[in-house]
């Protein structure tokens, strides 16, 4: 009986964490003090995170710090959280493309910030902040695509794993350089990479600090497709066309599908099935459902 109660409590907690907007992985009970971390990150300016929301339901999130290969400053980390919160509340949204400015994705963390945050406590605080942010990003009810142009290094490579899909241009490369910096991935990249390519391939990629060109990344299942163009504008257009095939339909249906997949990935079977039931209740008998039934009825006559 006690074992059953413990499992039920654990399940409901996981569901709450997965679906309640604004909840994070870490809190003060884990030694994480978000406001203090924000004050620290604010001391490291540079660059920006830009968000453009299109009428077709596709958002374009741009990592914009081209003088440093779009490395994340402390301020950019804060802005990323702000954009994630904005996207959580974008009810018309269906898809999202993440890219870097000036035809390169991101080189990870800004070394100026890294040098100033030299203690294990500093490292773990930033780790928890970025794990919180990228987990919320991963759970967005939007189908997300990382458009990898140029280099995705370190934390930039980790960010690509928080997206549902990855597309590369012919000349682009992904590299988890953490071992050469004397650390391991800390923005959730290891956990997500294992899910994407399996533990054996992930161990090779991480321990070898392998330079994954577009061909190799495609072969191991890291990316879905290699685009035809390396041009910044043309490759973005290609990525938009690629994404459109998965977001055709009403926002409420696309968003429910993404939430259902997140549940299947993160929850125990019983809880995932219950959540699937609840999500079905948000679309069954809705406008899109009734319209589709009416159309099918016409075809059957």
From Swiss-Prot:
Any GO molecular function: methyl/ethyl malonyl-CoA decarboxylase activity
PTM sites of type N6-succinyllysine: 211, 295
EC number: 4.1.1.94
Catalytic reaction(s) noted: (2S)-ethylmalonyl-CoA + H(+) = butanoyl-CoA + CO2; (S)-methylmalonyl-CoA + H(+) = propanoyl-CoA + CO2; (2R)-ethylmalonyl-CoA + H(+) = butanoyl-CoA + CO2
GO BP annotations, alphabetical order: fatty acid beta-oxidation
Record bears the keyword Cytoplasm: yes
Modified residues (N6-acetyllysine): 211
Compartment(s): Cytoplasm, Cytosol
Keyword Cytoplasm among record annotations: yes
GO annotation, cellular component aspect: cytosol
Record keywords, A-Z: Acetylation, Cytoplasm, Lyase
Primary location: cytoplasm
EC supergroup of this enzyme: lyase
Free-text function comment from the UniProt entry: Decarboxylates ethylmalonyl-CoA, a potentially toxic metabolite, to form butyryl-CoA, suggesting it might be involved in metabolite proofreading. Acts preferentially on (S)-ethylmalonyl-CoA but also has some activity on the (R)-isomer. Also has methylmalonyl-CoA decarboxylase activity at lower level.
Family: Belongs to the enoyl-CoA hydratase/isomerase family.
Protein name: Ethylmalonyl-CoA decarboxylase
Record organism: Pongo abelii
Gene: ECHDC1
